[in-house]
A protein has these predicted regions:
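Conserved GNAT acetyl-CoA-binding A-motif
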Residues: 122-134
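Acetyl-CoA-dependent GNAT
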Residues: 25-97, 102, 115-116, 121, ...
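Conserved N-terminal entry element of GNAT/NAT acetyltransferase domains
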Residues: 1-29, 165-192
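Conserved beta-strand-loop-alpha-helix junction that forms the acyl-donor binding cleft
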Residues: 106, 132-142, 160
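Active-site/acyl-donor-binding loops of N-acyltransferases
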Residues: 2-4, 148-167
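Conserved acetyl-CoA-binding loop-helix of GNAT-fold acetyltransferases
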Residues: 101, 107-120, 143, 147
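Conserved active-site alpha-helix within GNAT-family acetyltransferase domains
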Residues: 112, 136-155
Length: 192
């Protein structure tokens, strides 16, 4: 679910950006900003699988046929998309895995440009279609996908069963479940 406001302590631009935005391939130099933006924009407490680890994002840099891009305003990451060729057992399907746009840049077609370029790169790599998943309450992302040619094909529910953990016998503290949630990743690591 997208957050409505920027958390306290996160710097925001005083005025809306006015410069020309550049679309570039995701590079190592963008990793920290991509993770920061993704975690600022998505509420990972509501939907834990919307969060990514550094390892998961960095893994895309070495992947063949990667369709991972950033939109830059100078050196500032205004938005990003992570896409890959293969979805579950379908090597001919592309997967638009994660997209986020800084609130300062929303309304400037940054997300649509990222979606279109990601899909074009996946098509060039041999994808016959591109799939993505959108949380039911994330109406802004659902509308973005519809505007860019996606149609709803299936509904999937995330079922969660909390498990009680016994207290450790050696006096050690129980594992940090919040840390576990932060490192819970999406389908790419979940299935492979």
């Amino acid at each position: 679910m997208l957050r409505k406001a920027v958390p306290k302590g996160v710097p925001v631009a005083a005025d809306p950006p006015t410069s020309e935005l550049a679309l570039r391939p995701l590079g190592f130099e963008h990793l920290a900003a991509v993770l920061d933006l993704g975690h600022r924009v998505y509420d990972t407490d509501a939907m834990p699988y919307t969060g990514w680890s550094l390892t998961a994002v960095a893994g895309h840099l070495d992947a063949p046929n990667s369709a991972c891009l950033v939109t830059l305003d100078g050196d500032r990451v205004a938005g990003f998309v992570l896409g890959s060729l293969s979805f579950e057992q379908r090597a001919d399907w592309g997967y638009l895995e994660w997209i986020a746009v800084d609130p300062d840049y929303q309304g400037r077609k940054v997300a649509s440009r990222l979606v279109q370029e990601c899909c074009a790169r996946l098509a060039e790599a041999g994808a016959v279609c591109v799939v993505t998943d959108v949380e039911r309450r994330n109406t802004a992302s659902a509308e973005l996908m519809r505007r860019n040619g996606f149609t709803e094909r299936a509904t999937v529910s995330l079922f969660v069963r909390p498990l009680a953990e016994p207290a450790p016998a050696d006096g050690a503290t129980a594992r940090d479940t919040a840390a576990s949630r932060r490192h819970f990743t999406r389908a790419a690591e979940r299935i492979r």
